[in-house]
Swiss-Prot record:
The gene is rplV. It comes from Geobacter sulfurreducens (strain ATCC 51573 / DSM 12127 / PCA). Keywords: Ribonucleoprotein, Ribosomal protein, RNA-binding, rRNA-binding. One of its GO terms (biological process) is translation. PROSITE patterns: RIBOSOMAL_L22 (PS00464). HAMAP family: Ribosomal_uL22_B. Disulfide bonds: none annotated. Part of the 50S ribosomal subunit. This is Large ribosomal subunit protein uL22. GO terms for molecular function: rRNA binding; structural constituent of ribosome. It comes from the Bacteria. Belongs to the universal ribosomal protein uL22 family.
Length: 111
């Protein structure tokens, strides 16, 4: 049985979030949550929350044993980029890019 959860338009850089996601891909749920709890990156908190949401979705679908779940797939895609301008000297302006991410996680039972 599979259960999934999706986080869209997260105000996180996709490149930095992929570093966190790569640490938990293929791991069991308890191991993944432990890794994320001690990870200093800002995206670890949101990925952890997303994993807990996917576990709740699995329970809702009727998963018999939550401890047997593992991260089958987890991916980070880039979302739209918010563009802002900051005034600089001599009438110039510099662009500030605020990237967003779409994170998708799929959990499955270990066979």
């Amino acid at each position: 049985m599979e259960a999934s959860a999706k986080l869209t338009f997260a105000r996180l850089s996709p490149r930095k979030t992929r570093l966190v996601v790569d640490m938990v891909r293929g791991k069991g749920i308890q191991d993944a949550l432990t890794i994320l709890r001690f990870s200093p990156q800002a995206s670890a908190k949101l990925v952890s929350k997303l994993l807990r949401s996917a576990v709740a979705n699995a329970e809702q679908k009727g998963a018999s044993d939550v401890d047997r779940l593992y991260v089958k797939s987890i991916s980070v895609d880039g979302g739209p980029v918010l563009k802002r301008f900051v005034p600089r000297a001599m009438g110039r302006a510099s662009k500030i890019r605020k990237p967003t991410s779409h994170i998708t996680v799929v959990l499955a039972d270990k066979q």
